[in-house]
């Protein structure tokens, strides 16, 4: 699909519900002691996998994704393997849950997910007492023999909300306390939600301490996804004639790293929290920012914006001076090798960019000429290069653009709403 340059970009929009929070709301409601009501869940390929696995384990769901009632039941061993699709969150979080049930399960995924590392969850969960068998001890398919677990103190090798969440979810049914210590802070939805549900959780910096507990069902409205909003917010800053407002979006401080970096770069941007519902929710406003300055992204912000880091390269094209991202090797272990895909495709569009093992450097100001790109089936890269097309000279042809359905099924629909061509 060819995305042509836009004359003007303007509008007020709300983005789809938060994917990370939807996964966790579904899982926690299935683990609760009584029924829950969930509002505004994101329905996409990834979250459907979590829903379907929980259903196969015995959880009963009623209603639709705008209002869903969840009736938990004790999990029963499934007869067939459980399909995780392309969803790393489903795989890693459900590994933690399933490790704590004395039954046998098998998780498998598509070819992209089957290349993503799982040793990082296998290791701590085996220390707690579960048994795993995986391809090369690291990749899906993966068999889990759950057990009665013991709490552990575990230092994660990388800052990863998925690994932290897997261990904490396993710890809910373990004997004794579970402690997770990260090298840097990662998004905190799991511990924040558990704490709000009355589970004894203490957070001190990068250390999370959890005591085993049960909790009652709950009511929750899922806010808009800041990672989806990010594409529109960046577009608003780099387009020469733009004003965009995003409403009802999640503003959890462990997710606003991109907004912080944009402020450092001098973007015309502001955000405010308007309500709290297990998570802070609010509004982001952005307009054309002609005086962007290059920046070295601070290391402590990298895990708080891992999904948004490639967008920093797009900002860097239109910023004066050097924009540098380092300590982001984790980007190579996403749905695609996002560093390689970013660099190769930017070069196709006439942008000069330098690749590092753990990041990239771009020197602005430059322009995006146009051309064809291949996001390699990665939803976030397809959206990034679609935004690039709107600020290019000749337009950008995005191969396999349908892959955006993984997280943002109505992305192009919303884009059409704000673009004046």
From Swiss-Prot:
GO terms for cellular component: cytoplasm. Its main location: cytoplasm. It catalyses: 3-phosphoshikimate + phosphoenolpyruvate = 5-O-(1-carboxyvinyl)-3-phosphoshikimate + phosphate. Signal peptide: none annotated. GO terms for biological process: amino acid biosynthetic process; aromatic amino acid family biosynthetic process; chorismate biosynthetic process. This is 3-phosphoshikimate 1-carboxyvinyltransferase. GO terms for molecular function: 3-phosphoshikimate 1-carboxyvinyltransferase activity. Gene3D superfamilies: Enolpyruvate transferase domain (3.65.10.10). The active site is at 307 (proton acceptor). 3-phosphoshikimate binds at residues 19-20, 24, 160, 162, 307, 334. Its EC number is 2.5.1.19. Keywords: Amino-acid biosynthesis, Aromatic amino acid biosynthesis, Cytoplasm, Transferase. Catalyzes the transfer of the enolpyruvyl moiety of phosphoenolpyruvate (PEP) to the 5-hydroxyl of shikimate-3-phosphate (S3P) to produce enolpyruvyl shikimate-3-phosphate and inorganic phosphate. It is found in: Cytoplasm. The lineage of its organism: Bacteria, Thermotogati, Thermotogota, Thermotogae, Thermotogales. Phosphoenolpyruvate binds at residues 19, 88, 116, 162, 338, 380. Pathway: Metabolic intermediate biosynthesis; chorismate biosynthesis; chorismate from D-erythrose 4-phosphate and phosphoenolpyruvate: step 6/7. Belongs to the EPSP synthase family. InterPro entries: Enolpyruvate_Tfrase_dom, Enolpyruvate_Tfrase_sf, EPSP_synthase, EPSP_synthase_CS, RNA3'P_cycl/enolpyr_Trfase_a/b. Monomer.
């Amino acid at each position: 699909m060819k995305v042509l340059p836009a004359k003007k970009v303007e509008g007020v929009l709300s983005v789809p519900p938060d994917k990370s929070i939807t996964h966790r709301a579904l899982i926690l409601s299935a683990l609760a002691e009584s029924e829950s009501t969930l509002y505004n869940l994101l329905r996409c390929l990834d979250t459907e996998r979590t829903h379907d696995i929980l259903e196969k384990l015995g959880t009963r769901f009623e209603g639709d994704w705008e209002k869903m009632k969840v009736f938990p039941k004790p999990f029963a061993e499934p007869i067939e393997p459980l399909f995780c699709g392309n969803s790393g969150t489903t795989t890693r979080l459900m590994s933690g849950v399933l490790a704590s049930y004395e039954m046998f399960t098998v998780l498998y995924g598509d070819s992209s997910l089957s290349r993503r590392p799982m040793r990082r969850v296998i290791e701590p969960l085996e220390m707690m007492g579960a048994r795993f068998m995986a391809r090369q001890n690291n990749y899906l398919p993966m068999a889990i023999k759950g057990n009665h677990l013991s709490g552990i103190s575990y230092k994660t090798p990388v800052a990863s909300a998925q690994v932290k969440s897997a261990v904490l979810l396993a710890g809910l049914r373990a004997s004794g306390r579970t402690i997770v210590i990260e090298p840097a802070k990662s998004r905190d939805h799991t511990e924040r939600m558990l704490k709000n549900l009355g589970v004894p959780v203490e957070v001190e910096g990068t250390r999370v301490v959890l005591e085993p507990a049960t909790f009652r069902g709950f009511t929750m409205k899922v806010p808009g996804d800041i990672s989806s909003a990010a594409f529109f917010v960046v577009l608003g800053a780099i387009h020469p004639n733009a004003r965009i407002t995003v409403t009802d979006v999640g503003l959890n401080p462990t997710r606003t790293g991109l907004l912080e970096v944009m402020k450092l770069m001098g973007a015309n941007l502001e955000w405010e929290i308007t309500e709290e519902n297990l998570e802070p929710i609010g509004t982001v406003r952005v307009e054309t920012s002609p005086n962007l300055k290059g920046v070295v992204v601070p290391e402590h912000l990298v895990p708080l914006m891992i999904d948004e880091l490639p967008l920093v390269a797009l900002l860097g094209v239109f910023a004066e001076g050097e924009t540098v991202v380092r300590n982001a090797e984790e980007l190579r272990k996403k749905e695609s090798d996002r560093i390689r895909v970013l660099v190769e495709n930017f070069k196709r569009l006439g942008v000069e960019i330098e690749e590092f093992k753990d990041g990239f450097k771009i020197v602005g100001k430059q322009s995006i000429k146009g051309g064809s790109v291949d996001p390699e089936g990665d939803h976030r890269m397809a959206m990034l290069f679609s935004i690039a097309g709107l600020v290019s000279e000749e337009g950008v042809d995005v191969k396999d653009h349908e892959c955006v359905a993984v997280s943002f099924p109505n992305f192009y629909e919303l884009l059409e709403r704000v673009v004046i061509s």
